[in-house]
């Protein structure tokens, strides 16, 4: 079997992996099963905007499937070779096995009831519900109205749900599976510096116990890239940031540190938020996943 030695190896071409790569200014090898960047926010929006692009090619990614790994030694085995790294970033993401199936089934029905296995995925449930309501469907959701992000968020979400005409159900028929890791990876619990072992970093949805959220994943990728460049020595401070589009002109811009035991909560409602989301949907595909100046939003 061939062997290769690299300075920095990034596993995964999703939100976290590509932003780590961009932060390192391309000075790293990135491998993934997929050479395309998929912006899932735009893909979900595609159910109401059929011509919206949600994917972009990533020519700098080497298509590889990881079959084994020794994290402490920073050795990765693919189907073609063994790769030895000085710095290793684990960012393979996770998979919601039935997500596409739930959307397809919901699109085929006129009356829909939705739920999730994990409360952390309620933001996806609500966004899907708002878009289905926009299509004129009768939609009911099983939700806490994002109460785990703070009472201010819950109150605003309840109002948005009411205005959009979404109902509530205790017995949802279509349930979005929890995101699961893919062999040979598992969910990891890194330090507050997102380090698992010396020079082995974890980024994105593969972090155990965190919400599986694209904006958050991008920030972790930027952070670990900065750590390798010795530019970011402070600990990573996660924040849940999401724009919830109500489907009929109004939206919420949500920020909260509640999932990590913090007390910061901000929720802003306006007609500008959905327009900002439309910009973001196009920006990330055009920029091939690079967060860029949007890190300041």
Regions found by a protein language model. Give the residues of each.
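C-terminal, flexible cofactor-proximal segment of oxidoreductases
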Residues: 16, 225-297
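Glycine-rich active-site loop/strand segments that organize a redox cofactor
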Residues: 35, 44-53, 94-106, 262-270
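Predominantly flavin-linked oxidoreductase catalytic cores and closely associated redox partners
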Residues: 90-91, 95-170
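FAD-binding core/adjacent interface of flavoenzyme oxidoreductases
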Residues: 1-9, 59-119
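A Rossmann-like FAD-binding core segment of flavoenzymes
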Residues: 61-68, 73-76, 83, 134-191
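Beta1-alpha1 glycine-rich phosphate/pyrophosphate-binding loop at the start
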Residues: 2-60, 116-152
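Short hydrophobic core segments
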Residues: 11, 83-94, 172-181, 200
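FAD-site-proximal beta/loop scaffold in flavoenzymes
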Residues: 99-111, 176-222, 226
């Amino acid at each position: 079997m061939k062997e290769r030695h690299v300075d920095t190896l990034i596993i995964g071409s999703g939100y976290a992996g590509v932003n780590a790569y961009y932060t390192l200014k391309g000075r790293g090898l990135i491998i993934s099963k997929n050479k395309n960047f998929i912006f899932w926010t735009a893909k979900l929006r595609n159910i109401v905007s059929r011509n919206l692009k949600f994917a972009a090619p990533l020519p700098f990614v080497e298509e590889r499937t990881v079959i084994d790994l020794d994290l402490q030694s920073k050795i990765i085995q693919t189907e073609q070779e063994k790769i030895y790294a000085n710095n290793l970033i684990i960012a393979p993401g996770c998979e919601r096995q039935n997500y596409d199936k739930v959307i397809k089934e919901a699109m085929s029905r006129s009356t829909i009831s939705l739920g999730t296995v994990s409360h952390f995925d309620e933001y996806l449930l609500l966004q899907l519900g708002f878009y289905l309501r926009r299509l004129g469907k009768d939609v009911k959701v099983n939700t806490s109205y994002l109460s785990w992000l703070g009472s201010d968020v819950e109150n605003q979400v309840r109002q948005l749900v009411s205005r959009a005409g979404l109902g509530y159900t205790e017995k949802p028929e279509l349930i979005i599976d929890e995101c699961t890791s893919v062999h040979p990876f598992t969910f990891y619990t890194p330090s507050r510096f997102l380090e698992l072992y010396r020079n082995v970093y974890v980024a994105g949805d593969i972090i155990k116990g965190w919400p599986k959220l694209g904006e958050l994943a991008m920030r972790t990728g930027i952070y670990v890239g900065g750590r390798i460049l010795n530019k970011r020595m402070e600990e990573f401070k996660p924040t849940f940031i999401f724009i919830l589009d109500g489907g009929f002109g109004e939206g919420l811009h949500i920020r909260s540190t509640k999932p990590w035991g913090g007390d910061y909560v901000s929720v802003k409602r306006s007609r500008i938020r959905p327009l900002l989301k439309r910009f973001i949907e196009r920006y990330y595909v055009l920029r091939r996943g690079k967060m860029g100046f949007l890190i300041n939003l």
